[in-house]
A protein has these predicted regions:
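Bacterial N-terminal signal peptides that target proteins for export
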Residues: 1-9
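Bacterial N-terminal signal peptides
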Residues: 8-19
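Sequence context of c-type cytochrome heme-c attachment sites
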Residues: 23-192, 198-270, 274-294, 402-407, ...
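Repeat-solenoid scaffold signature
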Residues: 269-382, 387-389
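Soluble extramembrane regions of membrane proteins in the secretory/endomembrane system
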Residues: 355-400, 404-450
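Extended, compositionally biased alpha-helical segments that mediate assembly or anchoring
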Residues: 489-492
Length: 532
């Protein structure tokens, strides 16, 4: 590429100014292969760069941003205006969307902005901190302009240098000092694992805190920890399964991603195991598992149930979080001896960490019961079920899946029976963030004024539970539950205390004479299914 670099240097004084592009006409020039790049009387248009790069087999982004100063998203929109408009509608930017998988809210528009959880609890009033992982810039208040395409952060998904990073407390702005021109030169249409995992692994405030099956290790892991993403295995990108929607008018990618986390937004069809591997009988033919998988035998087991025997196998995950303990001056901070992670934080309370967490089992038909701010944020009993999959044995669409169970406690109003949102960070949504004043009452007043929640002025801490889908850290076949000759493989599940049979429709382990019973109601405590 030395030839065009020499040509560019000859006209750099002209082309370094964005005005040279803006002044160009709509008609693109014609270039011959090997022709030195030079501007015409009206300057270079974006289309001129595309034409030149195509004729000379050059990377358009590297060429363009070698001579044009990257000035934010508006630089991307010079060529990608349609994509910018599409991105305004994506769940990664709006943090909500068509919620057809949330029971009773299938026709509504909900998502991360409304969901309650028992990690950092909720987004409202805390936008300035949460939006470190927002695919945009400046979302620090509910007044944020979601209609302005220049607010979209293109680089966070398309950077290929690995150097791009968002600052912790600046509402999604990049870390100071990054050479954004080099980042812009590197962009590619297809996000790599680091683009996706860089944000999703940090959900909940740290590496693998929330999901348990999505850690930064998966960026460059081995087949032992994930057969699909391992560099010595499938080496697959996230988008291989989390595919994008396509515009119905012209077929172009419209930035909607299937399989959004937290089962909140439907933006396309997610790849499932059988799309690539075929049905259970075919894939297991000729293996030791062939006799176990068939009509009448384990046909209601989802693939993940056996092929994810444990999560957090390399990087630990948080399994308990107690907000009631926050606000104390603890010194020294206790460190978990097994994981090396802190068990206390004055801002957040006390925690429990684990490696090699065995998922819990529940029937699921793909729908979820969720708690939503202002729509369904009340409770009657404890532990409050914040996220429970829909389905049971009598539901022909439901199968047994693995889930991560998270337990803890968090603020509630004992009088109005409301699961409360606390104002934790920043002062744009109120003057009394808990992480500044450590006064729960003031922080809850701030949030109630901001969200419209019903707060009587009295608070307590209620026990909560939530279940989260487990789909990553697929182990090699030889590590799957049931692998190995019978009866040894059978004992992976059919042994004492491994499975709570009552929640999946049995009086006891069928190998011990258990009988089939009616399905357990969806409201059953998730804790009853923990696999210890």
């Amino acid at each position: 590429r030395a030839s065009w670099h020499m040509a560019l240097s000859a006209v750099a004084a002209l082309l370094l100014l964005p005005a040279a592009i803006q002044a160009a006409g709509t008609e693109s020039r014609e270039f011959a292969a090997g022709e030195p790049l030079s501007s015409g009387p009206g300057g270079m248009s974006a289309q001129d760069f595309i034409e030149y790069a195509s004729v000379n087999d050059e990377d358009i982004h590297e060429l363009y941003f070698s001579v044009i100063l990257y000035e934010g998203t508006q630089s991307c929109l010079m060529c990608h205006q349609d994509q910018g408009e599409q991105a305004l509608e994506m769940g990664h930017f709006k943090w909500q969307g068509k919620s057809e998988n949330i029971v009773r809210f299938e026709s509504g528009e909900f998502g991360k902005n409304q969901l309650l959880n028992n990690f950092c609890i909720a987004v409202p009033t805390n936008e300035g901190r949460c939006t470190q992982c927002h695919a945009g810039y400046g979302y620090d208040h509910k007044s944020y302009d979601f209609t302005d395409p220049t607010n979209v952060d293109c680089l966070v998904c398309h950077d290929q240098t690995g150097a791009y990073a968002k600052d912790l407390t600046t509402a999604g702005k990049p870390v100071p000092g990054i050479d954004l021109n080099l980042v812009a030169q590197s962009v590619d249409a297809v996000p790599q694992r680091k683009n996706c995992i860089g944000c999703h692994a940090k959900a909940g405030g740290g590496d693998n805190v929330k999901h348990g099956d999505i850690s930064t290790d998966l960026i460059a892991t081995t087949r032992e920890y994930d057969v699909h993403m391992g560099t010595d295995g499938g080496d697959m990108k996230c988008v291989a399964c989390h595919g994008t929607n396509h515009d119905p008018k012209d077929g172009s990618v419209n930035h909607g991603n299937a399989g959004m986390s937290l089962h909140s937004v439907h933006e396309g069809e997610m790849k499932v195991c059988t799309d690539c591997h075929g049905n259970q009988q075919n894939i297991h033919a000729g293996t030791e598992a062939e006799d176990m998988i068939g009509p009448g035998w384990h046909e209601r087991l989802a693939c993940q149930t056996c092929h994810i025997p444990a999560i957090a196998r390399k990087i630990s995950t948080k399994v308990e979080w107690y907000w009631a303990d926050a606000g104390q001056n603890v010194d020294p901070i206790p460190i978990d001896p097994d994981t090396g992670r802190p068990e206390y934080d004055k801002k957040k309370g006390s925690f429990k960490w684990e490696n090699n967490v065995r998922p819990v089992l529940r029937y699921s038909n793909g729908k979820w019961n969720r708690k939503l701010i202002g729509a369904d944020d009340n409770y009657t009993t404890e532990p409050i079920q914040l996220a429970v999959p829909q389905g049971d044995y009598n539901d022909p669409e439901a199968m047994i899946y693995p889930f991560k169970l998270m337990v803890g406690n968090q603020p509630v109003d004992p009088n109005t029976k409301t699961i409360l949102v606390p104002h934790l960070f920043g002062k744009k949504s109120g003057p009394n963030p808990y992480w500044g004043k450590f006064d729960w009452n003031l922080a809850l007043q701030d949030a109630a004024a901001y969200t419209g929640q019903d707060y009587s002025g009295e608070y307590a801490f209620a026990a909560t539970e939530m279940l989260m889908s487990v789909n990553h850290e697929i182990a090699p076949a030889e590590m799957a539950l049931g692998a190995g000759p019978s009866p040894d493989g059978c004992m992976d599940c059919h042994s004492s205390d491994y499975v709570d049979w009552t929640v999946i429709g049995w009086t006891d382990d069928p190998m011990n004479g258990g009988a089939r019973v009616s399905a357990t109601p969806s409201g059953l405590s998730a804790g009853a299914v923990r696999l210890d």
